[in-house]
Amino acid sequence: MLNEIFNKQKTQSEKSLEALKKDFTTLRTGKVNIHILDHITVDYYGTQTPLNQVATVLASDASTISITPWEKPLLKTIESAIAAANIGVNPNNDGESVKLFFPPMTREQREENVKQAKAMGEKAKVSIRNIRKDANDAVKKLEKDKAISEDEAKKAYDEVQKLTDTYTTKIDEGVKSKESELLKV
């Protein structure tokens, strides 16, 4: 019974950590990251399709992303989808591919991204605390139903807190790592 509670807490906490890492990919660092385009979809024969499923997306160099569609007629669609996504760059269609040129980031942009990273980390911590609350409620219910003793409940609460602390530390480390990556020129 308790192991199920702990396993559920671990699984949900891992998902929160993965969501945070995915959120971090949307933040622009000193070098381009093709994952900044992951959320962009294009109209492909009437269906909204992720950009990376209709084109080859490559980082040509530290400041350029090249998008080569598998079908030429998609060039205009890709260009307008990127423009609509408002990622801070204008797409450049050369007839073969769409190129995105990212200017060097200013100090202010870097600091703004650090703020966003910290906010993302805080959101993940709130999620971890909510998971802790659910786990503690499940332990409390077992104790109330006399399925476990008071001593077992105390140990379970300690284990739940230990797992919470572990994931909170992982989040803090992730935010600190992302912060140093963002501030590196």
UniProtKB/Swiss-Prot annotation:
Top-level taxon: Bacteria
Show the PANTHER family listed in the entry: MITOCHONDRIAL RIBOSOME RECYCLING FACTOR PSEUDO 1 (PTHR20982:SF3), RIBOSOME RECYCLING FACTOR (PTHR20982)
Matching entries from InterPro entries are given as: Ribosome_recyc_fac (IPR002661), Ribosome_recyc_fac_dom (IPR023584), RRF_sf (IPR036191)
Q: Where in the cell is it found?
A: Cytoplasm
Name it.
Answer: Ribosome-recycling factor
Query: What species is given as this protein's source?
Result: Campylobacter jejuni subsp. jejuni serotype O:2 (strain ATCC 700819 / NCTC 11168)
Give a short account of what the protein does.
Responsible for the release of ribosomes from messenger RNA at the termination of protein biosynthesis. May increase the efficiency of translation by recycling ribosomes from one round of translation to another.
Task: Write down the HAMAP family for this protein, in alphabetical order.
Answer: RRF
Family note:
Belongs to the RRF family.
